[in-house]
């Protein structure tokens, strides 16, 4: 494998005294460089006319940190070309858009009227608001119907303005609401197809990309020209409009932001039309708030110029009393009875993990999973440890579950059979979904991989499930990596990558709960013991190394990124040196754990891995704005000794008829 980069890209602040060192550190804004940055994987979509490859369009969520709680953001589009197993990003003029891991100063992204380079205030979807007016929809109460914004409908109090606020101040609030772009810090762009024109090689897709920001808005962008079709701002944020516009709050103590918004990623339910040219019969999208709050929103965007709020679910009430901050990206699937559902974890509990490094016996919020009807939002099934609040009581579900849920369909009938999820107590679970009329769903604790002290491992992200055929055995390999996302500077925890073998879904014998002793430590050079439950690899090559995203599995490899707060500075011997830290890409064999680690150019917290599929079976691996060869380190033509490995993808609900089966559309 070619090296991802030849040198580290860490940024360092030097100081000759403790006071100025503190100021220098605070200016790093939680390890995010003071430049155009991205912390989520780029948005990509499947080609509707060539279902086994991606479109050549890449969408980057970009932001620039400021010395207050409001950060500016943008969405930019580039073209991606794959050749020789590596990807290249091109600008609108056809030139290489990158200089190292940064956007070239001479690059002009799609939709931009002039060169915009790495400046997030120029070009992109943000720039298009200069030439088109924003259609802003809001809810006047939680869960209320959508209304189009009109300043005359609001009192000063409804905008969080003082009674004496003048008309000029009110106008400034309105102007900001109709023009601002906040930071899409954790929101990965979601592209949805709305049909198209032409056929074959001349087929031109009509696509919309959705992304949300910490300014409290969801944006729907026409990919052909960058124009905004609409923006949505729920009551929870428009009722505090002054905080996002004319009275932006400073950073609080400890360099913490005080203002968040719709910072989650979105998922889609899409019912296709009769042909790929036809508009879909139904499009609904689902997303949460992360640190912005404890609600999920479902929008009917079948008519993208006239969205409707289908439903809103909020934590701490009714069936969702245990739900915390909504970090888990919803998964759309079919439940038994072919009921379209949305599946998500119980969320994040800031009271238990923001300021408490010790392991608690039970988190206040988030220690549950939920399955709701995708069309109505009504609860279908839930599981957790508090029996009065959930349908299935699982005493071991004591810690919050901010990650997404891995959805598995064993028999390829389109209906969920198993769910895999992990929690902030270092535990891994599997839910077995009963397809019979009794609907006797159950949850099994598979592994306890956390503990106290240096073993207090937290799983913030979704496990990755791969199907492996070993001789006459079918096995699921479940990959997950730990890391204290809420405290990336932590150096006290021994984090690790774990790969667990699970044969129970294929009729294997039930197993006891696995602990660390049931896994082979492959960092010692030992071969995985097939009599054990799996293997693990301590992240100990750099101090405080941790993983902050889900692994990807491709070509018999587990690919995942890590971050170390201490390893980037060449002058670490200088006690007055503070670094952004260093990010890495790991590529290890799924079955044996053998592999290598490469240094990434981009400083700070890295996004996860994206595997791109292009024309002529070309593939490439992308990490944020960097690319690496998709060839395995030990790639050769003789793979007779390799078992059959297939990485499982989440199911999506598609309404199919026998004559329409060839027209499946998947965003």
Model segments located where?
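A fold-level detector for beta-propeller and closely related beta-sheet-rich head/sensor domains
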Residues: 1-667
């Amino acid at each position: 494998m070619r090296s991802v980069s030849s040198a580290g890209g860490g940024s360092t602040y030097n100081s000759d005294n403790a006071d100025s060192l503190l100021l220098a550190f605070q200016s790093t804004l939680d390890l995010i460089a003071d430049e155009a940055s991205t912390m989520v994987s780029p948005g990509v979509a499947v080609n509707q006319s060539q279902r086994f490859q991606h479109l050549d369009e890449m969408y980057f969520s970009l932001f620039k940190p400021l010395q207050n709680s409001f950060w500016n953001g943008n969405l930019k589009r580039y073209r991606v070309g794959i050749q020789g197993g590596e990807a290249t990003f091109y600008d609108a003029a056809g030139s290489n858009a990158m200089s190292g891991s940064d956007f070239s100063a001479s690059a002009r992204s799609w939709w931009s009227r002039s060169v915009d380079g790495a400046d997030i205030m120029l070009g992109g979807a943000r720039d298009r608001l200069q030439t088109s007016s924003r259609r802003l929809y809001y809810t006047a109460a939680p869960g209320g119907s959508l209304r189009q914004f009109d300043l005359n409908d609001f009192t000063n109090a409804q905008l969080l303005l003082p009674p004496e606020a003048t008309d000029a101040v009110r106008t400034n609030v309105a102007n900001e609401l109709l023009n601002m772009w906040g930071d899409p810090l954790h929101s990965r762009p979601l592209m949805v197809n709305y049909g198209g024109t032409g056929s074959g090689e001349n087929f031109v897709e009509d696509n919309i990309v959705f992304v949300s920001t910490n300014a409290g808005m969801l944006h729907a962008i026409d990919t052909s020209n960058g124009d905004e079709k609409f923006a949505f701002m729920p009551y929870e944020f428009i009722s505090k409009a002054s905080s996002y516009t004319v009275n932006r709050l400073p950073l609080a103590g400890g360099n913490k932001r005080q203002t968040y918004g719709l910072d989650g990623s979105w998922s889609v339910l899409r019912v296709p039309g009769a042909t790929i040219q036809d508009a879909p019969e139904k499009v609904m999208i689902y997303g949460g708030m992360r640190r912005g709050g404890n609600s999920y929103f479902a929008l009917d965007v079948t008519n993208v110029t006239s969205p409707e709020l289908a439903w809103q679910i909020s934590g701490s009430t009714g069936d969702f009393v245990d739900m915390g901050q909504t970090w888990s990206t919803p998964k759309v699937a079919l439940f038994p009875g072919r009921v379209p559902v949305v599946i998500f974890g119980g969320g994040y509990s800031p009271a238990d993990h923001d300021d408490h490094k010790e392991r608690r016996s039970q988190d206040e919020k988030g220690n549950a999973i939920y399955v709701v009807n995708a069309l109505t939002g009504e609860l279908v099934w839930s599981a957790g440890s508090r029996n009065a609040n959930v349908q299935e009581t699982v005493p071991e579900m004591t810690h919050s579950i901010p990650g997404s849920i891995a959805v598995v369909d064993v028999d390829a009938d389109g209906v969920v059979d198993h769910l895999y999820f992990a929690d902030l107590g270092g535990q891994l679970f599997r839910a077995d979904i009963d397809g019979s009329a009794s609907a006797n769903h159950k949850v099994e604790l598979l592994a306890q991989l956390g503990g106290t002290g240096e073993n207090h491992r937290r799983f913030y992200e979704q496990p990755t499930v791969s199907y492996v055929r070993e001789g006459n055995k079918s096995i699921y390999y479940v990959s997950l990596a730990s890391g204290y996302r809420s405290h990336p500077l932590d150096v006290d925890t021994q984090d690790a990558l774990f790969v667990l073998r699970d044969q129970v879904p294929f009729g294997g014998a039930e197993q006891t709960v696995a602990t660390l002793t049931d896994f082979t430590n492959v960092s010692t050079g030992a071969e995985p013991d097939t009599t054990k439950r799996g293997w693990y690899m301590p992240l100990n090559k750099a101090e405080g190394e941790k993983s902050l995203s889900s692994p990807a599995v491709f070509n018999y490899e587990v690919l995942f990124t890590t971050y170390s707060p201490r390893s980037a500075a060449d002058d670490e011997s200088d006690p007055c040196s503070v670094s952004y830290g260093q990010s890495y890409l790991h590529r290890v064999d799924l079955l044996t754990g053998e592999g290598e680690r490469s240094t990434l150019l981009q400083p700070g917290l890295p996004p996860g891995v994206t595997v791109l599929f292009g024309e002529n079976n070309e593939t490439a691996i992308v990490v944020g704005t960097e690319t690496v060869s998709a060839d395995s380190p030990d790639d050769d033509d003789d793979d007779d000794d390799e078992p059959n490995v297939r990485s499982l993808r989440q199911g999506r609900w598609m309404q199919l008829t026998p004559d329409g089966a060839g027209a499946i559309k998947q965003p």
